[in-house]
A protein has these predicted regions:
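The Walker A/P-loop phosphate-binding site
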Residues: 1-94
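Cytosolic-facing regulatory segments adjacent to core modules
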Residues: 31, 69-139
Length: 139
């Protein structure tokens, strides 16, 4: 099939509603971008605390069976800190418990057995998504 044929095939797919991108969970962003489309790269950037990690988590959560690879560049945190943030989001989403990075790493006090149980139970999820992440960090 030539590139012209592929283009027209995509146009036909769109007319039949099959080119809808993966939803981001942010309707206004989906309106402007068409969601995440195959073969189209999106650059998401923002200030610290603006929700970039949450957006990444939402995609990992909502599309676990999709073969989507995420490249994450960070100049402010290491890979371990990013994974800790994703772990925290998963635990909050799954169990309704927020465990801060300071608590997770026992910075101020020893991590409780209750929290440790949730962290251990979440390890399977973290292992299931790690192959979908390519992280370039500040180190």
């Amino acid at each position: 099939m030539s590139i012209v044929d592929e283009l027209y095939s995509e146009i036909d797919n769109g007319r039949e509603g099959r080119n809808l991108g993966l939803k981001t969970g942010l309707p206004k962003l989906d309106w402007y971008t068409g969601g995440f489309q195959k073969g189209v790269y999106k650059l998401i950037f923002g200030q610290s605390g603006s929700g970039k990690s949450s957006d990444l988590y939402r995609i990992l959560r909502d599309y676990p069976d999709r073969d989507i690879v995420h490249v994450y560049f960070s100049l402010e945190m290491s890979s371990k800190v990013l994974l800790a943030k994703l772990l925290n989001l998963y635990i909050y989403d799954t169990y309704g418990i927020e465990i801060s990075y300071m608590t997770l790493m026992s910075v101020r006090e020893k991590l409780s057995d209750k929290y440790y149980k949730y962290i251990q139970e979440s390890r399977v999820w973290l292992n299931s998504i790690i192959h979908k992440l390519i992280i370039f960090d500040k180190q």
